[in-house]
Design a protein with these regions (language model features):
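N-terminal alpha/beta PP-like core and its mobile active-site loop of ThDP/TPP-dependent enzymes
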Residues: 2-151
Length: 151
């Protein structure tokens, strides 16, 4: 077996593209598309992978993070939960805008894949750009807001 070297984002998109479902006897992609607003935390990794896999997993430019996620929920409802849309945003306020939609998806049991922008993993985020400032927990970030509304 030959070793394949991929970035995490490329491996993720290859995996998502490989997922299929059957609708009316036809094999179709489980993830038919993705909405994206690029910024710090997702442009260098997910942006490049989405561009390279555009023919297999179409990407659509969003204008507001909450509307992207709510559109994905509407798509899942229209498809009777048989297909799942993806929404990705930068970290910071963009990620926070998707929290309400995550709650809507959870309470209505509708599938939605949210990929909020990544935050620093190996150092404290200084100088402060768009991070959550909590002096009692300096490692807390925006993505922690998704914990109560995700599974």
């Amino acid at each position: 077996m030959k070793t394949v070297r991929l970035s995490c984002a490329h491996a993720l998109f290859k995996f998502l593209i490989a997922q299929k479902t059957i609708i009316d006897g036809k094999k179709v992609p489980l993830f038919p598309g993705a909405f994206a607003i690029y910024g710090h935390g997702n442009v260098a990794c997910l942006g490049q992978a989405m561009e390279e896999f555009q023919s297999d997993l179409p990407g659509y430019r969003g204008h507001h993070e909450q509307s992207m996620a709510l559109s994905g929920i509407g798509y899942a409802r229209a498809m009777r939960r048989k297909q799942i849309f993806i929404a990705t945003s930068s970290s910071g306020p963009g990620a926070m805008n998707m929290v309400t939609a995550a709650g809507v998806a959870l309470s209505n049991r509708l599938p939605l894949l949210l990929l909020p922008g990544d935050v620093f993993a190996s150092r404290f985020p200084d100088p402060v750009l768009q991070q959550v400032e909590n002096f009692n927990s300096p490692v807390e970030n925006q993505n922690d807001a998704f914990k109560p509304v995700s599974r």
